[in-house]
Amino acid sequence: VAQVNHLPAPGETVGDASFMQSLGGKGANQAVAAARLGGSVTFITSLGNDMYAEILKKHFKKEGITTDYIIDDVNQPTGTALIFVADSGENCIAVAPGANYSLLPGSIIHFSKVIDEADIIVMQAEIPYETIKRIALLAKQKGKKVLFNPAPACLIDEELMKAIDILVVN
């Protein structure tokens, strides 16, 4: 996160920024929050072939999150967001999804047991839409609750909408 007096205009360089790195991502933040509230959390995601993947795995384990189903994508970096926040509170964000987009619909078969054991499936839109849809439909078929936060904003087709029990919008 770069804190700046004002957001740079196209072609402008703002030289007054302060910078900090933090762990996160919508899915990661949801997993950590659920674990801190006492939930038994298994996090299914895809991380890249870089130091951030190892840092995140250690962080998740420290938070009590099961990491057995994290995919290691050796061909992509871990997903990253570049965030600028102006003193006014206005922000702009660029997401480089990297390994997030490696969580493909065909990989869901490997996670069927986790879905069987879950009480609720929590997802957001930083993974491929077809993966979200496949997981939601499978979870619904198994009688599981599905919570979906469509952020970043995305269109939700009728079939997916019918599989969602809780829709989080902001």
What residue ranges belong to the model's regions?
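Glycine-rich phosphate/adenosyl-contacting loop at the front of the ribokinase-like
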Residues: 1-46, 51-65
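Residues at secondary-structure transition points
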Residues: 14, 18-29, 51, 73-77, ...
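Beta-strand->loop->alpha-helix junctions that form or flank phosphate-binding loops
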Residues: 18, 44-49, 67-78, 149-151
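Short aromatic/hydrophobic contact patches that present stacked aromatics
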Residues: 20, 44, 81, 120-121
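Ribokinase/PfkB-type carbohydrate-kinase core domain
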Residues: 57-72, 83-169
